[in-house]
Amino acid sequence: MSAIPEPRIIENDDGSKTVISFKIQDGKKYKVTQKVKEITVTEKVNKNIALRRNWKKYGADKGAAPGPDISTTQLGEELELDLSPNWKEMEEEKAKEKAANSTQKVITCRICGGAHFTMHCPYKDTLGKKPTTSAGLDPAIGGGDMSAQGGSGSGRYVPPSLRAGARDPSSNAYQDQRERDDAKTIRLTQVNELADEEVLKRELLFPFGEIPRVFVVKNPETGRSRGVAYVTFQTEEIAAQALKLLEGRGFMNFMLHAEWSKPKPKKEE
């Protein structure tokens, strides 16, 4: 078998090079033609940075090539320093926004549990006023006397639903509240098993404001998600918007399917 010729390099008119080489594989000689174009990339850095790169290394890195060596150098997190003339004002605005958000989260209605004051609750006429006691607390929570909690003052435990002043879950008020929740609740299927309530709130539902309730259906035996989640929004309008945007959307390598938790009645034309 003849010897392999030396590689040839041909300069092209467009600035590229054609490299012709030969190789022997499985007893056969092959000709390999490669077209190579050299590109020079110029990096613009600060003058002082360029000077520091030329400093001579010492100690364990004496005589080493430029650049950090992972065996002797530990790289830290890269931080961006934003020097703005009005940085104090920006920090004050961020602090005010954070304080306002924390205040909104603290406010909770005692009637429906919404993020508003009890006196402004839109459901107070439907759900009724909470019974008042001498301490001004709900007897179901434990602010009343023993007769309100135990029924006879004997000290026996009485479930909250059977205590004095508690509302019957089968009453019209509870049914109305349940229907209102269903009207603004959507059902998500084909949800990734790794997505729990916090992941859904943080990475999927954040554009829709505060989410009152997220529930992921899990297998009671294994504790793993069944790929189904129920999401309750603040209003029915927001729920309708979320339904439109989440239907067919990709999330964690799965295509979501969104529908109402309770089918809507068809409007008569």
Swiss-Prot record:
Residues 141-154 have a biased composition (Gly residues). The keyword Protein biosynthesis applies. Transmembrane segments: none annotated. It holds the Pfam family eIF3g. The keyword Zinc-finger does not apply. Keywords: Cytoplasm, Initiation factor, Phosphoprotein, Protein biosynthesis, RNA-binding. GO terms for biological process: formation of cytoplasmic translation initiation complex. Residues 140-181 are annotated as: Disordered. It is found in: Cytoplasm. GO terms for cellular component: eukaryotic 43S preinitiation complex; eukaryotic 48S preinitiation complex; eukaryotic translation initiation factor 3 complex. Disulfide bonds: none annotated. SUPFAM superfamilies: RNA-binding domain, RBD. GO terms for molecular function: RNA binding; translation initiation factor activity. Residues 184-263 form the RRM domain. InterPro entries: eIF3_g, eIF3g_N, eIF3G_RRM, Nucleotide-bd_a/b_plait_sf, RBD_domain_sf, RRM_dom. The modification Phosphoserine is found at residue 161. Belongs to the eIF-3 subunit G family. RNA-binding component of the eukaryotic translation initiation factor 3 (eIF-3) complex, which is involved in protein synthesis of a specialized repertoire of mRNAs and, together with other initiation factors, stimulates binding of mRNA and methionyl-tRNAi to the 40S ribosome. The eIF-3 complex specifically targets and initiates translation of a subset of mRNAs involved in cell proliferation. This subunit can bind 18S rRNA. Component of the eukaryotic translation initiation factor 3 (eIF-3) complex. This is Eukaryotic translation initiation factor 3 subunit G. It comes from Kluyveromyces lactis (strain ATCC 8585 / CBS 2359 / DSM 70799 / NBRC 1267 / NRRL Y-1140 / WM37). The lineage of its organism: Eukaryota, Fungi, Dikarya, Ascomycota, Saccharomycotina.
